[in-house]
């Protein structure tokens, strides 16, 4: 939920000035795009394709909202409603990030392909350029805990105020939590090839590789964030124990980081048809990359933390096909090293948060069975079952709060939060006519952990959808869809402010109010698409 008045005060990270953000500032975005798609068939059998696109978004803004913890306050704590009356009861700490950006990119891909006997060859070239000019500002606020929350104000001392005089404010904690800034570009120039080799009528081998020259040049602010953080030379102020005002000098300026690296990827896939309908398949892929420009918008990796990200994937299984069924069952292993993430850690029972830079690994072993079923004319069913176990590796962090207390989080070998171990998809569709179809979609998400240390979790739940699509003619399409058909209620995702809660401490929160995301309620949507 957001502030009712539609606007709020914040500290601009770039200018260091207090400004007002209106809700529409995050909606009025603009982008222009032009594309060229072409191909040419040579007489000698080679096929040439060229795809090019240029996009410019001079305004690419959006707003993020998050929560922290829920606590109970008394009138003596000084919280007031907008009419000036004192408030007592439950409050939720709220967090907001305002993202302001300008983006442009130019993408070019050209390929040559040809069938040579039992080889299907393809060689291609990528030239991808991306430019980003981006910053974000953050602040905190408090809302009442009720059906229609109201914004609260309280006494706040701005660390940029040399008099250290308290004033009433609805927003506070300016730029303490992960404000971001970067400006620069990245360029990817790559050469790649693939070969689909039909060794025998029953045995097929597919392999390929890609080599990429990657250049990134970005402005980065590696300094830790704090209340009142912004670019420039300035002072923050605090009151000492003896009542004197202490000034602290800051000089915050971006520094350029330039990297020239080689990324690579390779893949190998084998398929063997035991019979005309049944077969075996296996494949292995490895892909690498170095940190992207977007990962320098925060404090970014240091030189010691700048490492290659490696993503290996290995899987194998069986498949079966006939006139009405296409079935496959695969076991998959995948991992990813050196993930870069900024994690906001909240002190349990309070709304105080700190941001830390984390570099960690993820790996998962899973089994997926999927089926495409066409039992009778005009009816199609997609079905999927997945069991997986995604876990964190090398996930350790510690943070020191304002009272001097240091707390740590250790998520090693813990299940990745927000990712269920069991997934089920059921998607039936019936084509009433050539241009009119009805569809349903059922999604089951199994038990899902809501924090990093497996202390809190949500039970499994179903999400349901349905609708009708009508292609009126080549220019007009109409549709109606229903979300949450059975109006299921509940929570999902994560629980705000729970990052540092351990399994041993989870019992303390039984019967306590906590905040997070809820299932989208029963909704009916109508849509129309017009093509010229």
Stretch-by-stretch model annotation:
Residues 103, 118-120, 126-128, 180-336, ...:
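Structural signature of Gram-negative outer-membrane beta-barrels, strongest in the C-terminal barrel
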Residues 45-48, 118-121, 202-205, 277-280, ...:
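Repeated loop/turn-to-beta-strand initiation elements of outer-membrane beta-barrel proteins
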Residues 18-63, 92-126, 130-136, 174-204, ...:
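Outer-membrane beta-barrel transmembrane strands
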Residues 54-60, 116, 127-133, 211-217, ...:
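Transmembrane beta-strands of outer-membrane beta-barrel pores
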Residues 41, 47-53, 273-281, 285, ...:
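Membrane-embedded beta-barrel scaffold of Gram-negative outer-membrane proteins
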Residues 309-316, 380, 414-532:
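Conserved C-terminal beta-signal and adjacent last beta-strands/turns
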């Amino acid at each position: 939920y957001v502030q009712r008045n539609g606007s709020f005060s914040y500290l601009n990270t770039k200018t260091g000035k207090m400004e007002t953000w209106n809700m529409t500032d995050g909606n009025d975005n603009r982008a222009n795009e032009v594309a060229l798609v072409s191909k040419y068939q040579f007489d000698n059998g080679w096929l040439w394709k060229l795809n090019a696109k240029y996009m410019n978004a001079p305004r690419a803004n959006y707003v993020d909202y998050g929560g922290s913890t829920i606590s109970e306050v008394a009138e003596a704590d000084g919280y007031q409603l907008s009419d000036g009356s004192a408030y007592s009861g439950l409050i939720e700490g709220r967090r907001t990030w305002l993202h302001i950006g300008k983006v442009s990119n130019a993408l070019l891909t050209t390929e040559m392909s040809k069938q040579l006997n039992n080889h299907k060859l393809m060689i291609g070239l990528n030239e991808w350029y991306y430019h980003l000019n981006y910053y974000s500002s953050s602040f905190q606020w408090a809302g009442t805990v009720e059906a229609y929350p109201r914004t609260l104000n309280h006494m706040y001392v701005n660390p940029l105020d040399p008099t250290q005089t308290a004033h009433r404010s609805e927003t506070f904690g300016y730029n303490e939590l992960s404000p971001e800034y970067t400006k620069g570009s990245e360029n990817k120039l790559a050469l790649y090839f693939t070969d689909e080799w039909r060794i025998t009528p029953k045995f097929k081998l597919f392999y390929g590789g890609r080599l990429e020259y990657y250049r990134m040049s970005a402005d980065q602010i590696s300094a830790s964030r704090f209340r009142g953080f912004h670019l420039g030379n300035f002072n923050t102020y605090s009151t000492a124990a003896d009542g004197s005002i202490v000034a602290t000098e800051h000089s915050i300026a971006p520094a350029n980081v330039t990297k020239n690296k080689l990324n690579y990827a390779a893949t190998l896939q084998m398929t063997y048809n035991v019979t005309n309908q049944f077969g075996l398949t296996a494949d292995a892929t490895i892909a690498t990359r170095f940190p992207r420009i977007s990962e320098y918008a925060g404090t970014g990796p240091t030189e010691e933390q700048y490492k290659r990200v490696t993503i290996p994937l290995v899987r194998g299984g069986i498949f079966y096909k006939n006139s009405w069924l296409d079935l496959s069952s695969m076991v998959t292993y995948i991992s990813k090293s050196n993930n870069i993430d900024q994690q906001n850690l909240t002190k349990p029972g309070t709304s105080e948060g700190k941001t830390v830079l984390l570099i960690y690994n993820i790996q998962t072993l899973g089994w997926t069975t999927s089926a495409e079923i066409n039992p009778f004319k005009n009816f199609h069913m997609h079905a999927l079952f997945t069991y997986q176990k995604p876990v964190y590796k090398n996930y350790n962090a510690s943070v020191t709060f304002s009272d001097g207390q240091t707390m740590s989080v250790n998520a090693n070998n813990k299940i990745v939060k927000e990712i269920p171990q069991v997934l089920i998809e059921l998607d039936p569709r019936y084509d009433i006519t050539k241009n009119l179809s009805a569809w349903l979609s059922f999604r089951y998400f199994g038990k899902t952990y809501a924090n990093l240390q497996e202390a809190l979790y949500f039970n499994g739940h179903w999400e349901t959808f349905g609708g009708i699509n009508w292609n009126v003619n080549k220019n007009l399409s109409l549709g109606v869809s229903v979300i949450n058909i059975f109006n299921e209620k509940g929570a999902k995702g994560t629980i705000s402010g729970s990052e540092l809660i351990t399994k041993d401490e989870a019992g303390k929160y039984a019967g306590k109010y906590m905040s997070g995301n809820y299932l989208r309620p029963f909704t009916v949507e109508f849509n129309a698409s017009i093509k010229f």
